[in-house]
């Protein structure tokens, strides 16, 4: 046995003390009894070993916008925040809409990524090529490219589609992007999924009505996510700080409360990490950095009794694996030995000065939180410990399952 992790971890929804054996970067054994190994990592009391957390919505910029973020800086931010896999959004500059650009992106990741990664492909009337997932913007957002025929692009996709659901016509007429823009778009997605029965994932749900539509639809092939900024911030925060401009916008306190009230029914939490420089933000750019703050904010919520560690594992590990069909990840024998180790008792203050993102600011500046990521392990190797990035870029592309079916609690489609 090369490496043995010893400490407290979650198994079958229970927290237990045990041992995890790692060989050749894979989980080789999970046991309550001691495992002998060449190298032991002992996790002290008050700290918990979580399976490696996955963020299915990340904008890493690079290409012509490497001054905002690069694959190197963004994946350093990811592992600093306890994220072991990032899903790379394709609305880059230039956008990833052909095979040549996708291959260029993969080449960059192979050389620069500190985290494992999934590669996205943008659909807006173009021909799809094989990718890990596809992205459709129903209305213009950062990058300005949107699908003029959503249903056609959705049908054309070769695998699951992540959808930015804001109706183009409504946001053209009402640039403040009112709730109806999201609601109308969600209605269209639901109808398309009912008709074509192809997997779809709606990004960053922000409204109570949009959430209700999705929960009532009970479609096996349709999943969705919420972001920490829609869970922790509201329109009144934006009124005080225009840097908090984001699409979809921060909503009312009623909407925020509705997301929390239904948090047990939300399949995925994702950051929608969308970094811009302060200069670009002051000029009106939409998007918030979030890779390094999402897990600490959620750990703090665990300490406050709003959610459980099991909820975090389900929404940032178990469900992303099911929904996006990731073959090589999971907390079981034979899967990659990825772990996010957290100190549930550590109190600290979020400061932009201590973050790896190039954004240079955070919406949560000065927030006092209880709970911190202290170590990140990818394929059995420590890549971050106590805020320090360790070693060179060693990220690998995820392995996708073949035609995967998903079951997130409902087998009905109606």
Swiss-Prot record:
<feature type="binding site">
    <location>
        <begin position="286"/>
        <end position="287"/>
    </location>
    <ligand>
        <name>substrate</name>
    </ligand>
</feature>
<feature type="binding site">
    <location>
        <position position="91"/>
    </location>
    <ligand>
        <name>substrate</name>
    </ligand>
</feature>
<feature type="binding site">
    <location>
        <begin position="59"/>
        <end position="61"/>
    </location>
    <ligand>
        <name>substrate</name>
    </ligand>
</feature>
<feature type="binding site">
    <location>
        <position position="272"/>
    </location>
    <ligand>
        <name>Zn(2+) 1</name>
    </ligand>
</feature>
<keyword id="KW-0862">Zinc</keyword>
<dbReference type="GO" id="GO:0005737">
    <property type="term" value="C:cytoplasm"/>
</dbReference>
<comment type="function">
    <text>Catalyzes the reversible cyclization of carbamoyl aspartate to dihydroorotate.</text>
</comment>
<keyword id="KW-0479">Metal-binding</keyword>
<dbReference type="InterPro" id="IPR002195">
    <property type="entry name" value="Dihydroorotase_CS"/>
</dbReference>
<keyword id="KW-0665">Pyrimidine biosynthesis</keyword>
<comment type="similarity">
    <text>Belongs to the metallo-dependent hydrolases superfamily. DHOase family. Class I DHOase subfamily.</text>
</comment>
<feature type="binding site">
    <location>
        <position position="59"/>
    </location>
    <ligand>
        <name>Zn(2+) 1</name>
    </ligand>
</feature>
<feature type="binding site">
    <location>
        <position position="135"/>
    </location>
    <ligand>
        <name>Zn(2+) 2</name>
    </ligand>
</feature>
<protein>
    <recommendedName>
        <fullName>Dihydroorotase</fullName>
        <ecNumber>3.5.2.3</ecNumber>
    </recommendedName>
</protein>
<feature type="active site">
    <location>
        <position position="272"/>
    </location>
</feature>
<dbReference type="InterPro" id="IPR011059">
    <property type="entry name" value="Metal-dep_hydrolase_composite"/>
</dbReference>
<feature type="binding site">
    <location>
        <position position="57"/>
    </location>
    <ligand>
        <name>Zn(2+) 1</name>
    </ligand>
</feature>
<dbReference type="GO" id="GO:0004038">
    <property type="term" value="F:allantoinase activity"/>
</dbReference>
<feature type="binding site">
    <location>
        <position position="204"/>
    </location>
    <ligand>
        <name>Zn(2+) 2</name>
    </ligand>
</feature>
<keyword id="KW-0378">Hydrolase</keyword>
<feature type="modified residue" description="N6-carboxylysine">
    <location>
        <position position="135"/>
    </location>
</feature>
<feature type="binding site">
    <location>
        <position position="135"/>
    </location>
    <ligand>
        <name>Zn(2+) 1</name>
    </ligand>
</feature>
<dbReference type="InterPro" id="IPR032466">
    <property type="entry name" value="Metal_Hydrolase"/>
</dbReference>
<dbReference type="InterPro" id="IPR050138">
    <property type="entry name" value="DHOase/Allantoinase_Hydrolase"/>
</dbReference>
<feature type="binding site">
    <location>
        <position position="164"/>
    </location>
    <ligand>
        <name>Zn(2+) 2</name>
    </ligand>
</feature>
<dbReference type="InterPro" id="IPR004722">
    <property type="entry name" value="DHOase"/>
</dbReference>
<comment type="pathway">
    <text>Pyrimidine metabolism; UMP biosynthesis via de novo pathway; (S)-dihydroorotate from bicarbonate: step 3/3.</text>
</comment>
<dbReference type="Pfam" id="PF01979">
    <property type="entry name" value="Amidohydro_1"/>
</dbReference>
<feature type="binding site">
    <location>
        <position position="276"/>
    </location>
    <ligand>
        <name>substrate</name>
    </ligand>
</feature>
<dbReference type="GO" id="GO:0008270">
    <property type="term" value="F:zinc ion binding"/>
</dbReference>
<dbReference type="GO" id="GO:0044205">
    <property type="term" value="P:'de novo' UMP biosynthetic process"/>
</dbReference>
<dbReference type="GO" id="GO:0006145">
    <property type="term" value="P:purine nucleobase catabolic process"/>
</dbReference>
<dbReference type="InterPro" id="IPR006680">
    <property type="entry name" value="Amidohydro-rel"/>
</dbReference>
<dbReference type="GO" id="GO:0004151">
    <property type="term" value="F:dihydroorotase activity"/>
</dbReference>
